[in-house]
Amino acid sequence: MIALQIAALSGAVPLLVSDYDPARRALALKLGADLALNPADADFAEQVREATGGRGVNAVVEVTGVAAALKQALKYVAREGRISLLGCTRVPDAAIDFYQDVHCPGVTLIGANTWNRPRFESRPGQWTEHDDYRTFLQLLAVGKMQVRPLISEIVSPEKARDVYERLITAKNPPLGIVFDWKQYSD
């Protein structure tokens, strides 16, 4: 229930909880869950997909430590979603097809052990390409990203062959070369 509250405070939407116990499901709703489901329901994964518009959940916090629960989570997590293994899954009571359930959909499994927690919620490569471009252009606009010092020379596109040859063969190739298309003579 603490994980549920942290997720709520972090802005998880929709915030789904699954539990076999109806009293715990009721408590989860009081603590901020948008939907509390019974994982034993035959259509459980379908209920999750419906609640998420067919996408699946972006992040799962698996707190039971039961391998069957992890296997079930792999069926409703979104493509490129994350599953945090807060519960300690020690008994391999459910076979998991890592190729189909983890590799192909790009799911990230995170061992959430007290001793290996990240200090900050930032991981290399977590941003999208769009985020990278937007941030880079913002940094340029406010002068925090300097690109002019990275340009070694400006040349006519007619010298492209020479430029690429130098980039391939030079012991210390130029840092950056810009083609000035105004110099191009057709």
In which residue ranges do the predicted regions lie?
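Mid-domain Rossmann-like dinucleotide-binding core that forms the NAD(H)/NADP(H) cofactor-binding site
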Residues: 1-42, 46, 59
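C-terminal capping/lid region of NAD(P)-dependent oxidoreductase domains
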Residues: 20, 54, 84, 91, ...
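C-terminal substrate-binding/catalytic core of Rossmann-like NAD(P)-dependent dehydrogenases/reductases
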Residues: 49-50, 96-151, 162
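A glycine-rich helix->loop->beta "capping" turn
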Residues: 51-59
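N-terminal Rossmann-like NAD(P) cofactor-binding module of classical short-chain dehydrogenase/reductase
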Residues: 58-61, 84
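Beta-loop-alpha module in the N-terminal Rossmann-like domain of NAD(P)-dependent dehydrogenases
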Residues: 63-71
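Short strand-turn motif at the edge of the Rossmann-like AdoMet-binding core
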Residues: 64, 87-90, 113-115
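Helix-to-beta-strand junctions that scaffold the AdoMet/dcAdoMet cofactor pocket
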Residues: 77-79
